Amino acid sequence: HRDELLLFDRLVGKGGAVQLPVIPVRTPGSRWISGHYCDEFAEAHGKTLVVREALGAALPLAGVACAIDRQIIGRIAVRAGGRPFDDNSLTEDYELGLRIGSAGGRTIIARILDRNGELIGTRACFPDSMTASVRQKTRWLTGIALAGWDRLGWQGNWAQKWMLIHDRRS
């Protein structure tokens, strides 16, 4: 969206990170597979992240449509030996979002309309074949539900722990 950078500039200093909605685009001819992803992301970015932010739990980043404040990424880098993006992680964007919360930052989910009434966000296509879908879901399940226990533990307040249960259910 043409206003993304302006919105990032306006909001990133207010919390530590900004996540714009990911607006799912269904791949023609892939109603069931691509459509399934569209439904999941619409649910996550339309409701779950909004509730998560309201509860004060850390927000996972989507890997697209996000901006991170330099000070918070610097704090994370210091804690991580100069490497804020962990290349050993299967879900580095998800983990980075939670680490922003652990470092004292707050991610803002910015559901804001432009002057024409259009949602400011990033459109994204999702896997459209069974093979690509299984590969993606396996990475997410392994990275969040299984490795997340060891990599991130169960830290945070009750809202954070509740959302970790939500994330890690399989």
Label each region the model flagged:
Residues L55-A57, R115, L119-S170:
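Basic/Trp-rich segment in TM-proximal cytosolic loops or flexible interdomain/linker regions
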Residues H1-R115, I120-R123, S129, R135-T138:
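Internal catalytic domains of large membrane-associated glycosyltransferases
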